Amino acid sequence: HVGSGSEKPGRTGFAHLFEHLMFEGSKHVPEGAFDTLLEGAGANNNGSTTVDRTNYYINGPSNALELMLFLESDRMAYLLDTMSPERVDGQRDVVKNERRQSIENRPYGIPELELDSMLFPTGHPYSWSTIGSMEDLSAASHEDVQEFFRTYYAPNNASLVVAGDIDIAAAKALVEKWFAEVPRGKPVPPVAPPAAMLTEVTRRTMTDQVQLPRLYLGWLTPATYQPGDAALDVVASLLAGGKN
């Protein structure tokens, strides 16, 4: 249960950086073996990061469930055993290139980034991009990154979901087998982003190397699953979900 909303000013991009580092090998899974083992079992995997959570998933046949649980437990318990400064530097560069491709070098990328900083006050955990700033990524030390992992990557701060053609009792036994000895982390305070309220209309005009002008409109809306959220999803779909 960690996303960019758990980060602090000056330490942005850590949640997304770990989405990359988690696939780089752990104590009992050599670099590259995570994907190779799953592919050999007919499974696929990926991950994603938002402001509120980081998600890792594996889709595969039910007879590969134990392999999936072993791989997940090993990187939760033993990632730091193999997370060298060189490995962090390598994935840091990958993330910075990803940012260039998705923001700096993409038409309209910067205005989309600026919208969050206009909707949320400076220092609010939703005011920066999930991918982090170039400055923060460059400044992140190996010790900073290790501390982030120790704080958030523990069984008491994670949810495990197993679904599909499984025997529930057998699945629970496998979960117990592979996760029971993974040590709990320290209690993680729940993230409660300070309430944001716009008191006036904010406008910003930007110049970029694009062929056509573009207008962005943004509003602060109720939190997910709160009253009004579903209705606004429908309104957004009606206003911007199609060409007509």
Regions found by a protein language model. Name each.
Residues 85, 92, 143-178:
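Non-catalytic, conformational "gating/processing" segments within enzyme and secreted inhibitor domains
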Residues 9, 66-69, 105, 173, ...:
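Solvent-exposed, non-transmembrane alpha-helical starts
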Residues 69, 83-116, 166, 173:
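Non-catalytic accessory/assembly modules
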Residues 25-28, 59-91, 240-243:
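M16/insulysin-pitrilysin zinc metalloprotease superfamily fold
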Residues 3-4, 30-64, 101-157, 181-226, ...:
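Non-catalytic beta-strand/loop surface segments
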Residues 16, 56, 72, 95, ...:
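Divalent metal-coordination and catalytic microenvironments
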Residues 1-34, 227-239:
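Active/ligand-binding-proximal structured segments within catalytic/core domains
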Residues 23-27, 79, 168-169, 179-185:
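Bacterial peptidoglycan biogenesis and beta-lactam-recognition machinery
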